[in-house]
């Protein structure tokens, strides 16, 4: 599978690159970012996947979070895909910011006209890791995942649906219980249809309640002044309650004065990289 390099920039001794490829799952051209730390020049490194939030491309995280310093320090290859298929010419794909383009929600759609292209779940859990493992100096056995908002939801469900696949998981302001919030209801009804029982397969709170896999340590940071926390889109309390009931270890940090933005992410990104490095470099 041919990769086309779009850009390459030296950063903290490593290289921040962006590539384009033709996705089999999504049936369109996709871009992803990959950071190769200095350690990747001499051997295989663990892989850490970042999933971005609504409206984002592969660019937001790599240009705003400043994660490269910590990734360089801990020797992690960090991969950041786009948030949806692009340019599929599906009627309505560009009509709203929270559905369609830039809003794939990391599910495999089952409804027309989305089901042929909107397969972000399989893309981030199967196709992209296979592509990364084949083309970059990563250790396929050492992989973790994290994300923000819609991407925090994506990271949590990918980890919970695949016990043992990821060494660790973390999230910034994740959409924790999408079956109960308006963003989730809109996306899931569009991509997965009206049967709400099918939605639960992509809801972190529902997945935790049924989880029986190997222990996974979860780190979540949430800004206390996040407008989407106060208006009921994120619902972290439901997720924490489910984790507590199932005795799944979760560190939940409510950060005073912080909002939903990349300023919040940039403040705590090094903590998250450290969290993953602890498991990936063990």
UniProtKB/Swiss-Prot annotation:
Modified residues (N-acetylalanine): 2
The keyword Secreted is assigned to this record: no
Active site positions, chain numbering: 149, 226, 260
Keywords from the UniProt entry: Acetylation, Cytoplasm, Cytoplasmic vesicle, Hydrolase, Serine esterase
Positions where N6-succinyllysine occurs in the chain: 4
EC category name: hydrolase
GO biological process, one term: formaldehyde catabolic process
Protein EC: 3.1.2.12
Residues bearing PTM N6-acetyllysine: 200
Catalytic activity: S-formylglutathione + H2O = formate + glutathione + H(+)
A UniProt-annotated Pfam family: Esterase
Localisation: Cytoplasm; Cytoplasmic vesicle
GO cellular component: cytoplasmic vesicle
Molecular-function GO terms, alphabetical: carboxylic ester hydrolase activity; hydrolase activity, acting on ester bonds; identical protein binding; S-formylglutathione hydrolase activity
Complexes and interactors: Homodimer.
Function: Serine hydrolase involved in the detoxification of formaldehyde.
Family of the protein in this entry: Belongs to the esterase D family.
NCBIfam families per record: fghA_ester_D
Name under which the protein is recorded: S-formylglutathione hydrolase
Organism: Mus musculus
Lineage: Eukaryota, Metazoa, Chordata, Craniata, Vertebrata
Gene: Esd
């Amino acid at each position: 599978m041919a990769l086309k390099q779009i850009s390459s920039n030296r950063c903290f001794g490593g290289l921040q690159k962006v590539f384009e490829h033709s996705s089999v799952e999504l049936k369109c051209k996709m871009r992803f970012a990959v950071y190769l730390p200095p350690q990747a020049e001499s051997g295989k490194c663990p892989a850490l996947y970042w999933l971005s939030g609504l409206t984002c491309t592969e660019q937001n995280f790599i240009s705003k979070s400043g994660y490269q310093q910590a990734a360089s320090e801990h020797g992690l290859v960090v991969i950041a895909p786009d948030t949806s298929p692009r340019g599929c010419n599906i009627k309505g794909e560009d009509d709203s910011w929270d559905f369609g383009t830039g809003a794939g929600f990391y599910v495999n759609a089952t409804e027309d006209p989305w089901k042929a292209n909107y397969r972000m779940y399989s893309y981030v859990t199967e196709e992209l890791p296979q592509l990364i493992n084949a083309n970059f100096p990563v250790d396929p056995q050492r992989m973790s995942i994290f994300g923000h908002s819609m991407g925090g939801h994506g990271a949590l469900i990918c980890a919970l649906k695949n016990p043992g696949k990821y060494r660790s998981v973390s999230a910034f302001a994740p959409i924790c219980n999408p079956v109960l919030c308006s963003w989730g209801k809109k996306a899931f009804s569009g991509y997965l249809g009206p049967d709400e029982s099918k939605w639960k397969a992509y809801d972190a709170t529902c997945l935790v309640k049924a989880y029986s896999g190997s222990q996974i340590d979860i780190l979540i940071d949430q800004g206390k002044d996040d407008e989407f926390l106060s208006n009921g889109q994120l619902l972290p309390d439901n997720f924490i309650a489910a984790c507590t009931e199932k005795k799944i270890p979760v560190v939940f940090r409510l950060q005073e004065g912080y909002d939903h933005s990349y300023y919040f992410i940039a403040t705590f990104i090094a903590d998250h990289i450290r969290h993953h490095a602890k498991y990936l470099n063990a």
